Every structure is written in C-alpha cells, then in structure tokens.
Regions:
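Divalent metal-coordination and catalytic microenvironments
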Residues: 9, 29, 49, 80, ...
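Hard-cation-handling environments
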Residues: 294-415
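Conserved small/polar residues in nucleotide/adenosyl-binding loops
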Residues: 426-433
Length: 443
C-alpha cells in the first residue's frame, strides 16, 4: 500500500513535455509511480483541476539566519519552493567567533537589507564552526529542505579579524587557514563556497564586504581547498562578467579546481547581446563547467527613505546632515526648498560604475506603487515619467521620494532587464542540451 496518492492532477513535470493528467503515488517519502494507479493508499488527495508540479529549488536565497528560527521559511514555502540554497554572495553566519557575531549581522543587513534587529533577536548562536552551524540547521524542524554554502565574508572575519575587509592581502598562513575552513565546511555537508566582487555589497557602515578585492591567488587557494569534494560548487557575484579578462580568470580557476562555477552578473555589459550566456556556452564547449544564474523574471532591489539605499544616499548633504535623523525629521528636512536645491546641485560620492550616472540609472528605477508591476516598461520608470512631464529626472526622483509620508518604495531590476523584457534570456541556448527555450505565452 502506498502512503499517499495524488489523483487526477494535471502534471507539469518540468522537462518541457506537454502537461498530462495522471495519478502520483508516494511511498517512504519518494515518488513510487506515475500514471493510472488502482492500488489504495493511506491518504489520497483529489487534485482534479489542479496543477501538480515538482517543487521549486531556489538556488539563491539568504535565509541563513531565518532558517535557524522559522520552520516554514515564509514566503518561499508559500509559493511552491521545496528546497532553498543559502550562503550566497559570500554572506552568512558561520564560522563565527562570539566577538564577530554583530559584524556578520551588520554585513548581512547591509548587503541584503535584512533587518539587523530581527537577526539579533532570532539567531541563538548555538555554533561557532561551520559543521556546528549545519548541526543546528539539521536539528531544527522545518517544512522544506535547506542547503548552504561556506561564505567568504565569514571565513575572512574568522581568520583575519578586523582586517578582513580593509586588508586585501592575507598572509600565506591566513590563506591556508581559510582554505582549511572551507574544506571543513564542505566535508561537513556544505554545497560549496561563495564570494562577491561587486561594489554594490557593503555593510551598514559603508565598508565593502570581505573578499571584494581578494586576489586571484587567494580565490584559487580557497577553491583548491574543496577540490574533489562532493561535486562542490563555487558561486561568484561580480561586477566584471562583461569583461573578457574576468572570464579568462574564471576559466583558469575552474580548470585548476575542477569545481562547478556558478556566476551572477551585476552590470549591464554582461547582459548586452547575451554576452555572459554566450561566453558561458563557449566555455562549456571548451570543457569548462561554468553556469550563469538567471532569473525567470526580473529580480532586483527595493529602495527608499526607509531602506539602506536610495538615489541620494551618496550625496554629501545626506551623509553629513540627514542620515542620522528619524523618519519624520528627515521628510520635513527634505521638503525644505533649500535642502532640495542643495542636494540636487551635488554629485554622488559613491565610486561605483552602476551608480556614477544617476540620471541614466533612473531609466531602470520604478515607483513600486500599491499594485507592483515587476515587468515594467520604460514609460513607468522615473526617467520615463520625467520625459513625459518634461522635467529634470533627478528632481522627479527627489519629489517621488518625499511624496506622501516619504514611504514610497522604488523597484530597480537587476540581471539583464535593460531592454525592458527578458526576450534575450528566453531565447539563449540551454547549456544542457542546446534546445532553444520557448517564448512565454502572452496570456
């Protein structure tokens, strides 16, 4: 007898095959049969008229803290996700020395905008080493599966202490220690190791995250630390994946370590004319196991006056006079005509390719509104609104930021949405079998 039978569901199996109606039998936690099933089960579910699909595996999440206190991992589990991968972008909470706990929280808060107060209250720190962190995850009841990676930021903090994000060159002994910690984590069950080389990632104090400027020698040593272990993965977020030089380094790294490399690009040049995907396909044909990560719909960041970033956060007046004010005081000051005039006359001090030309960036910034649209057109952007109204684009951004109670959020897609659709992604070749993806229905 089966444990469970899901009857008469419309199955979409994830292979690209046409949907079909069938029964699914479960035994001992595994699918035992699919088709017309006449045997009984301890429990049956009538799924007629319902879609039955594989659970989603979300390969890029930041539940590293939440997974230690929330068995449901909402909202992912609400949307059909059955496995989440954490430890991305080089941020996470193990290994950790007691004195560095607040630093790792501040790092996660700055990089991923997860409230530090929630992390401080929720994490009980029943671990120091990475294997102990895995034990803590395993001992906690949960509705869905979790997997994680060893984060570069935590590794550097553990070995280098206060020098972790200010000293770009660790000693040989420190590199050896970090490589051993990576190996220890992967041997204990981590999927691999993650790092970040984007200037977008900073802690709440504005310091670049540990590993941002790590040299190729350090990266290679850490990769070699998990060579040959458990089909390990190396995940890298980078500002430079539109540059041929970066790809040569990545290919050499993959060749020497034998690891599967998965990449996330943060800048438009990597996506222009599908450059990153074409380079990945070329690398695959050369024998390199390199897989870019791609979103099935635009993903990005939300920013506003109540988040850690907005269009004017790099302006001197903001940093020197406004950043420490409470929200009501801040909105009142920003509505002062002289403050507005002063800020609009300034230039950002943020030294980042993506943020250097703020007026151009406004073509990729959209007021979220009460009914969010996550696939907006240019006309919906701040630049589109400014063009329609024949107004200065940064003045429009300023006015939208302080309208109402100053609580408006702005959506900035990342990851190849510069053409205002995902057509290039949808038609890029599949590294697995070279089949062309089918364009989505307009329905």
């Amino acid at each position: 007898m089966y444990d469970l039978i899901i009857r008469n569901g419309t199955i979409i199996d994830g292979t690209g095959n046409d949907r079909y109606v069938a029964d699914i039998a479960i035994k001992d936690g595994k699918i035992a049969s699919v088709g017309e099933i006449n045997e009984p089960a301890d429990k049956e579910i009538d799924a007629e008229g319902k879609l039955v699909t594989p659970g989603w595996v979300d390969v890029h999440t930041h539940y590293d803290g939440q997974a230690t206190w929330d068995p449901v991992l909402a909202p992912s589990s609400w949307h059909g996700v059955t496995t989440v991968v954490m430890g991305n972008c080089g941020v996470g909470f193990a290994p950790v020395k007691p004195k560095d706990r607040d630093f790792l929280i501040e790092l996660m808060e700055g990089v991923e905008d997860i409230p530090g107060a929630a992390l401080s209250e929720g994490i009980d720190w029943q671990w120091e080493s990475f294997p102990e962190y895995l034990d803590a995850l395993e001992s906690f009841p949960r509705a869905i599966d979790v997997a994680t990676q060893v984060p570069h930021g935590a590794i550097r903090a553990y070995v280098m202490g206060e020098r972790c994000n200010s000293d770009y060159a660790p000693t040989k002994d420190e590199v050896d220690q970090m490589a051993e910690l990576v190996r220890e984590g992967v041997e204990a069950g981590a999927l691999g190791f993650s790092s970040s080389k984007t200037l977008l990632h900073k802690d709440i104090n504005g310091e670049y995250m540990p590993g941002t400027f790590s040299g190729n020698e350090e990266m290679l040593a850490l990769g070699l630390g998990m060579k040959g272990l458990n089909n390990s993965v190396f995940e890298l977020v980078s500002d430079h994946l539109g540059e041929d030089e970066e790809w040569e380094w990545v290919k050499d790294f993959q060749k020497q370590t034998g690891l599967t490399v998965t990449l996330i690009a943060t800048t438009a040049p990597a996506y222009k004319n599908n450059k990153m995907y074409n380079l990945a396909e070329q690398a695959r044909l050369e024998g390199h196991e390199i897989r870019p990560q791609a979103a099935g719909r635009p993903t990005g960041v939300l920013h506003g006056l109540q988040s850690s970033f907005h269009a004017f956060v790099g302006h001197p007046t903001w940093k020197d006079e406004l950043a420490s004010l409470n929200h009501d005081e801040l909105v009142a000051r920003l509505r002062d005509p002289e403050t507005k005039k002063k800020i609009l006359a300034e230039e950002t001090t943020i030294k980042n390719e993506l943020l250097q030309d703020l007026p151009s960036l406004m073509g990729q910034v959209f007021p979220l509104g009460e009914k969010p649209n996550y696939e907006p057109e240019f006309k919906d952007s701040v630049a589109g609104i400014a063009l329609e109204c024949n107004l200065d684009v940064m003045e429009v951004m300023y006015d939208l930021l302080v309208q109402g109670e100053g609580k408006e959020l702005f959506y900035q897609p990342l990851g190849g949405y510069h053409t205002y659709d995902f057509c290039l992604l949808y038609t890029s070749p599949s590294p697995r079998d070279k089949r062309q993806s089918r364009m989505p229905s307009s329905a």
